[in-house]
Amino acid sequence: MREKIKLESSAGTGHFYTTTKNKRTMPEKMEIKKFDPVARKHVLYKETKLK
């Protein structure tokens, strides 16, 4: 089953993306480089809980 997650910027800007992931095939926390429009550069986004 796919679960909704939040990817939060490690730049400290407070920007985040929401996405889904399959927890059965990828049980570890996701880390991906994406564009942060507040910092205006690519930064590392880390998975956090979606409240």
UniProtKB/Swiss-Prot annotation:
Residues 1-23 are annotated as: Disordered. SUPFAM superfamilies: Zn-binding ribosomal proteins. One of its GO terms (cellular component) is cytosolic large ribosomal subunit. It comes from the Bacteria. Residues 10-20 have a biased composition (Polar residues). InterPro entries: Ribosomal_bL33 (IPR001705), Ribosomal_bL33_CS (IPR018264), Ribosomal_bL33_sf (IPR038584), Ribosomal_zn-bd (IPR011332). One of its GO terms (molecular function) is structural constituent of ribosome. GO terms for biological process: translation. PANTHER family: 54S RIBOSOMAL PROTEIN L39, MITOCHONDRIAL, LARGE RIBOSOMAL SUBUNIT PROTEIN BL33M. NCBIfam families: PRK00504.1, PRK00595.1, rpmG_bact. Belongs to the bacterial ribosomal protein bL33 family. This is Large ribosomal subunit protein bL33. The lineage of its organism: Bacteria, Pseudomonadati, Pseudomonadota, Betaproteobacteria, Nitrosomonadales. The gene is rpmG.
